[in-house]
Amino acid sequence: MEIRVIDTKENKLLGRKEIYFEVIHEGEPTPSRADVKGKLVAMLDLNPEATVVQYIRSYFGSHVSEGYAKAYESKERMLYIEPEYVLRREGIIQEQEE
C-alpha cells in the first residue's frame, strides 16, 4: 500500500490541516481507515490522537482509492468540532450502554 498526498490545506479558522490523498493498493483490498491513518501520521508527522480519516472511496475495477483526512492542532479542538458519529467510528469515544 502506497499513499500519495494530492493536496494539503491549512484551515486556520477550525485549527486543522485538510489532507486529500490517494491510496494505491494493487492486488489488495481497500485498506482500513486505521491502516491509512497510521501511514498518514507517520508520513506527515501528525498527532495520532487528533487525526481523523473522513473517507476512503474506492471505484470498481480500480486499484487506486481517494481519501480525505483532517489533522487537528489538538485533541480538544477535534472533540469540539467533529460530530459524535465520526469520533465513535474512529474509536476515540466509546459507545455508552443503556
Curated annotation (Swiss-Prot):
InterPro entries found in the cross-reference section: Nucleotide-bd_a/b_plait_sf, Ribosomal_eS24, Ribosomal_eS24_CS, Ribosomal_uL23/eL15/eS24_sf
GO biological process, one term: translation
GO molecular function terms attached to this record: structural constituent of ribosome
Claim: Ribonucleoprotein is one of the keywords in the record: yes
GO CC aspect terms: ribonucleoprotein complex; ribosome
Pfam families: Ribosomal_S24e
Keyword tags: Ribonucleoprotein, Ribosomal protein
SUPFAM superfamilies: Ribosomal proteins S24e, L23 and L15e
HAMAP family: Ribosomal_eS24 (MF_00545)
PANTHER family per UniProt: 40S RIBOSOMAL PROTEIN S24
Protein family: Belongs to the eukaryotic ribosomal protein eS24 family.
Protein name: Small ribosomal subunit protein eS24
Native species: Thermococcus sibiricus (strain DSM 12597 / MM 739)
